[in-house]
Amino acid sequence: MRVLIGFLAFSLFIVGAGLKPAPTTADPVNREFWTWYVQKMPPEDIMVKATCRGIGQNLYVFVNDVDWLRPVTQADVDRIIEAFDRSTPADPQKGIYQIATEAFGLPPDKDGDPKIYILISELGEFRGHHFDGFFRYLDQTNEKGSNQLDMLCVDAHDPASEYHLGVLAHEFQHLIHWRYDQEEEGWVNEALSELCMILCGYYTDKRHVETFLKHTDRPLVAPGHGATSYGACLLWATYVYDRLGPEFIGWWVREPGQGIKGFDDAIKHTAAGAGVKPAPTFNSLFADWMVALYINDPGVQNGLYAYKSLSLPFGPFCEDVTSYPSEREAEVSGYGIDYIRFSLPAAGRLGIIAEGDSPGLLIEVIETNKEDPSLTRVSEHQGKEANILVDNNGGIYGEKEVVVAVTVLEATEKPVRYHLKATLEQ
């Protein structure tokens, strides 16, 4: 398993080192950098010797001397410069730097040099988890152990692969975000970094998407710097981008508020929240997202429940109910999702009584017809109790599929209990 270190908040105390000025020619320049040794936790600050192996319009590429030619090559360096400066899978005329800065904003420019330092160095593993790259926030401070410059670190194993170029885009958003909001909640920062990968054309975290779609009960919202579902973050931020557009994304990054409040405040500053009544909110968009993950059809509701910027490998896992009456006692995390699917035969009537322990309990009922997707209907029920009735209109259109998506619209420390009782009349 590979993991990204993006926004760690460790307190590091270490003796500083003299910093050399940035290179100004394409000739190799030697210097020392502070970096993290991540093969133990919390990570330790260590110093490595590196040589500049390439200079682009927006970056310097340094390679740890012990990794040069084993395994890092000049071809790797050249490809990284090409991707960062000039060309990405999303746009052959735009590099990672241009796409990211247009979408999210400018990097901090800690040292007064607009170029970004890229350090390629073997990162290794910790307890079976391989590290791919990180933005080391300490470099944006004047503390001991800081390089005092804008720098990203990428693992030395195949550093110019599409996967690691995606990591570079991901970590670059973290660097940009530091300039605007150093206190942002981790799940928001990770969501925007995953979006940066998608905007640059690196859908290389698809395995995280697949994991989430198999386990959608993993919460999107992890307050503070709690455990993050990268799959949920990627799918959420991309859906928000497709719904609200690039202008909103820029406001979201620059909004000084954090978490859900910051999201809602950002909407108020953009066209996304102007002239629309009621204006969208985090919770209303989350409800639509629950439906979009299942439907993902541009032909339904004028594309309200569909992705434009990516394709889903498959739909979310659903628990199927095939016999009646049926009862389900379960739990769902705040901003996690459970999907329960019922088959409604022709001329059938499905009744569902729902009750839960939280007033934030939300149920989205999705009615679909396999023969005619235009007949898809969505209804919403919120509160501790709900009585849901789905009538198949006398069976005119044949069998109907009914999916109940359940969540709690509040962050919770523990999952919330709910109960569903379903009956079928024919």
Predicted regions and their residues:
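Acidic/His/Gly-enriched intrinsically disordered linker/tail segments
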Residues: 140-147, 162, 166, 181-243, ...
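Short, low-complexity intrinsically disordered segments enriched in A/P/G/S/L with frequent Arg
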Residues: 17, 21-22
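Positively charged n-region of N-terminal signal peptides that target proteins for export
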Residues: 1-4
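Beta/coil-rich, acidic/histidine-enriched accessory regions frequently appended to metallopeptidases
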Residues: 23-25, 259-426
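Generic detector of solvent-exposed, compositionally biased contiguous segments
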Residues: 27-46, 93-98, 198-226, 325-333, ...
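Juxtacatalytic substrate-recognition/specificity segment
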Residues: 57-185, 192, 202-206, 214-222
